[in-house]
Amino acid sequence: MDADPVELRVLGCLLEKQRTTPDQYPLSLNALRLACNQTTNREPIVSYDEGEIHEALQRLARRGWSRLASGAGSRAAKYRQLFDEALGLGGDEVAILCVLMLRGPQTPGELNQRTGRLHAFSGIDAIHATLDGLAARGLVERLERRPGQKEERYRHLLGVDQQESDAQHSPTSTRSDELGSSAAPAGLEARVAALEGEVARLREALSTLARADAGPT
């Protein structure tokens, strides 16, 4: 799947608010903007405007993941998500994907703590079971445990988000970073060597001129 960062943030907010503030759901464009840009329970913090959010809603609608849902007499357009219906997801699966969309890669322990308002998991074993089910469907993947980490982390596979940790945890990206970091010093050394050679040539030219000036008149 190839949802972009704005789509993922908008979708995550629709899923979250449907469950945490059902009396205010569906959401208006302004309510979605506030939800997307709030500074709690969001990683990274963003500042999307209504135009960006509206365009993301249109892309989500084309995927069949959201739709306009204004009721009779409503003065503002409101939107709801169709993601769970489109993918046939249960409440436990939605809760985990929602947190991964809004907060980036998480450990099972973090998911157990942060899904409390979205779904009543019976414990960490239930989190693991749900993650296994999502992984089997190609919706999440387990990331390599980094040195010093006690738990593995999981990320969603719905698209590309803005979490730098995604690239840092990805084995492919990590390898690319290592190659880039090793290539940088080598390139720098080559430039320094070239500059040193140029300086040596300039010194030789100046020395030649000095000898010529000091010759017999």
Q: PLM features: residue spans?
A:
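Intrinsically disordered, low-complexity serine/threonine- and proline-rich regulatory segments
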Residues: 1-19, 23, 57-88
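Short, amphipathic alpha-helical interaction segments positioned at domain boundaries
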Residues: 72-110, 152, 156-187
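Amphipathic alpha-helical oligomerization/assembly segments
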Residues: 178-213
